[in-house]
């Protein structure tokens, strides 16, 4: 039976450190502020925004919410971002994705000042991750690295397989593992003989978006399996990994919920703190 990698425990440790540093900055007269923009009324996005606000309050970070109508124009949205870029009390800006179809997401991401881009989606920050000289890391991959380190799972020299090549998880995840001297393979929908590749992984990261996609026969004995998937089925949250069978074979596994999910918001808070420190010369 696998050891459960508890993201709630790791997230609590990260948030505790952030809260301490926010207090320390407060004693120096520096506040930390995060602006969250939500366009439209996507229910899942509303839940994420609510959770971010709650976590900000817990850690002493000021939360600024901008709730815009789903019909807002791209130019109006970019104009708001421009205002926030120039507002000293706001250290981080996050525009909740997905955006309505009439708005170009990349144009909006590019409008956010790179030093306030706490999601690390701006092309400048993506480029910095590529060369290993980064200020911010995308929250989910950074959270996964935090989990691996917290539980002492060795990365250097290991075979790591990432299933999924999204800009939000798959690609940056592979770069972070590479920077830690792992041998990394990225798999996707066109990968041939997927099972042959994944069953060689010491660390397997599943970011596919299909419930129960990874089965026991795809996993190496003693592997660490990281499940990024959040799939809803009849009100139940399911990961990309078939937990019951894979947990009998892997040495380590993250559950869904309670694995990677809690880390994403914790790392967002850490990025916001980093932004505040940089903007105030700390």
Predicted regions located by residue number:
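Short beta-strand segments enriched in small/hydrophobic residues
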Residues: 31-40
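Rossmann-fold NAD(P)-binding glycine/threonine-rich loop
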Residues: 106-122, 126, 229-279
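Anion-binding alpha/beta catalytic cores of soluble intermediary-metabolism enzymes, centered on
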Residues: 95-155
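Positively charged, low-complexity intrinsically disordered leader regions
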Residues: 1-30
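Short glycine-/small-residue-rich Rossmann-like dinucleotide-binding loops
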Residues: 98, 207-210, 229-230
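Glycine-rich phosphate/diphosphate-binding loop of Rossmann-like nucleotide-binding domains
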Residues: 39-53, 135-224, 236-247
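Short, well-structured alpha-helical segments in soluble
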Residues: 76-88
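Short beta-strand elements in bilobed, periplasmic/extracellular small-molecule ligand-binding domains
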Residues: 34, 56-70, 184-186
């Amino acid at each position: 039976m696998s050891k459960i990698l508890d993201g709630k425990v790791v997230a609590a440790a990260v948030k505790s450190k952030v809260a301490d540093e926010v207090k320390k900055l407060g004693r120096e007269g520096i506040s930390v502020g995060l602006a969250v923009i939500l366009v439209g009324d996507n229910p899942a996005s509303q839940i994420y925004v609510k959770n971010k606000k709650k976590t900000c309050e817990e850690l002493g970070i000021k939360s600024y919410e901008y709730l815009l109508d789903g019909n807002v124009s791209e130019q109006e949205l970019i104009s708001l971002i421009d205002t926030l870029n120039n507002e000293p009390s706001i250290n981080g800006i996050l525009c909740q994705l997905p955006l309505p179809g009439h708005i170009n997401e990349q144009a909006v991401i590019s409008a956010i000042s790179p030093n306030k881009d706490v999601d690390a989606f701006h092309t400048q920050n993506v480029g910095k991750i590529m060369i290993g000289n980064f200020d911010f890391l995308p929250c989910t991959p950074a959270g996964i690295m935090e989990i691996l380190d917290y539980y002492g799972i060795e990365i250097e020299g290991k075979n790591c397989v990432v299933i999924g090549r999204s800009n939000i998880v798959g690609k940056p995840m592979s770069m972070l593992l590479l920077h830690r001297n792992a041998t990394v393979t990225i798999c996707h929908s066109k990968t041939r003989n997927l099972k042959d590749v994944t069953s060689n992984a010491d660390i397997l990261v599943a970011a596919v978006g299909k419930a129960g996609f990874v089965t026991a026969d795809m996993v190496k004995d003693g592997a660490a399996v990281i499940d990024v998937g959040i799939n809803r089925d009849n009100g139940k949250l399911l990961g990309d990994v078939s937990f019951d069978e894979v947990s009998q074979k892997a040495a380590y596994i993250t559950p869904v919920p309670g694995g990677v999910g809690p880390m994403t918001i914790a790392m967002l808070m850490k990025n916001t703190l980093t932004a505040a420190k940089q903007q105030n010369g700390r």
